[in-house]
């Protein structure tokens, strides 16, 4: 089930960031960033929650991308799914939710950058 990220998700976000992305950003710093970014309309934070357990299984974080050469769109800053549930359509659902929000806002595109060494991520993005 898709929903907004919440302050109660901090531990799960920290775990997913560490396990899926290899980032070791402290839970305290994660909580601080989540609180700040949640209030900023230029950031969109969407969660995927297991309907039975209510556990956070993944999230997408996008920011508004604006320039002098195009209309506004979204720039994906992070898309992460717990490794234990990857391959079950969660990442695709998160991207579809982001696409719906982009359409609702009248945005014309969604973009992202992915590091060269993240070959699994590249294959996923090409597939969706």
Residue ranges, per PLM feature:
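Short coil/turn motifs at secondary-structure junctions
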Residues: 64-67, 81-84, 117-119
């Amino acid at each position: 089930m898709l929903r907004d990220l919440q302050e109660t998700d901090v531990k799960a976000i920290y775990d997913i960031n560490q396990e899926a992305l290899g980032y070791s950003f402290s839970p305290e710093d994660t909580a601080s960033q989540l609180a700040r970014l949640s209030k900023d309309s230029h950031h969109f934070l969407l969660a995927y929650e297991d309907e039975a357990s209510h556990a956070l299984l993944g999230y997408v974080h996008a920011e508004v991308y604006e320039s002098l050469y195009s209309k506004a769109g979204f720039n994906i800053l992070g898309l992460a799914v717990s490794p234990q549930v990857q391959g079950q359509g969660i990442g695709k659902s998160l991207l579809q939710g982001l696409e719906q929000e982009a359409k609702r806002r009248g945005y014309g595109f969604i973009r992202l950058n992915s590091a060269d060494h993240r070959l699994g991520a590249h294959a996923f993005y090409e597939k969706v």
